[in-house]
Regions:
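Transmembrane alpha-helices and adjacent helix-loop boundaries
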Residues: 1-218
Length: 218
């Protein structure tokens, strides 16, 4: 017999766990977007060396499991440096670096979709390259790559449960700790699954609204 009332005393802890999940996803997405944009520009640059290095980076992070990257960063950072990285920092760093590899490909496609005439027009008008990239190219690249960016954010949110492996007190970690205390594993993980589902549906809804708004502006 299911008994969710056993979990009620632990719901305040769940609120904090959900907040950590959202905060983690937000910072990972921001880091992934910034890194992805830089990588996209490098892969499109005229420097063969930089372009090659960027492609190697993308290949490595897309070709190896995210969980392995997470564990490597968490345990190798203190070993290779004098800095003791926290579990949350290791999670944001590994997810951000991984996400950048995927977002870069989406943004690269978005940049290539921008009409070449705009590049030529900007050069003829003498617009500084950095202003042209940030003010003209980036907004259009985001618009072109928006569906892929929304999907990547959703994947980050779902995959955020992996950080519980290194001890981050996120939503899945909450369920794991509560089932150990109450021995109600099914109820605890059902609640965690429901929370993730609601968060993903909310993010998907916001993404759909944003895509509609962008289409209307066209």
């Amino acid at each position: 017999m299911l008994d969710f009332s056993v979990l009620e005393p632990y719901f305040p802890l769940l609120v904090n766990a959900v907040w950590i999940t959202l905060k983690f996803t937000f910072f990972s997405t921001i880091m992934g977007f910034i890194g992805g944009f830089i990588l996209a520009l490098i892969t499109l640059s005229k420097s063969r060396v930089l372009s090659f290095l960027a492609k190697v980076y993308i290949s490595v992070f897309r070709g190896t499991p995210l969980l392995v990257q997470l564990i490597l960063i968490y345990f190798a950072t203190p070993q290779l440096t004098s800095y003791t990285i926290s579990a949350l920092e290791a999670g944001v760093l590994s997810f951000g670096l991984n996400s950048a590899a995927y977002i870069s490909e989406a943004l690269r496609g978005g940049i290539l979709a921008v009409d070449k005439g705009q590049w030529e027009g900007a050069m003829s008008l003498g617009i500084p390259k950095h202003r042209f990239l940030l003010d003209i190219i980036l907004p259009q690249a985001i618009k072109n790559a928006l569906p892929s960016l929304v999907n990547e954010s959703i994947m980050l949110l779902k995959d955020s449960s992996l950080v519980s492996v290194i001890g981050v007190a996120d939503t899945l970690r909450w369920a794991d700790l509560i089932q150990a205390k109450t021995f109600r594993a099914f109820e605890a993980f059902i609640v965690a699954a429901a929370v993730y589902y609601v968060l993903v549906m909310a993010l998907n809804f916001l993404g759909s609204l944003l895509e509609k708004k962008v289409r209307v502006s066209d």
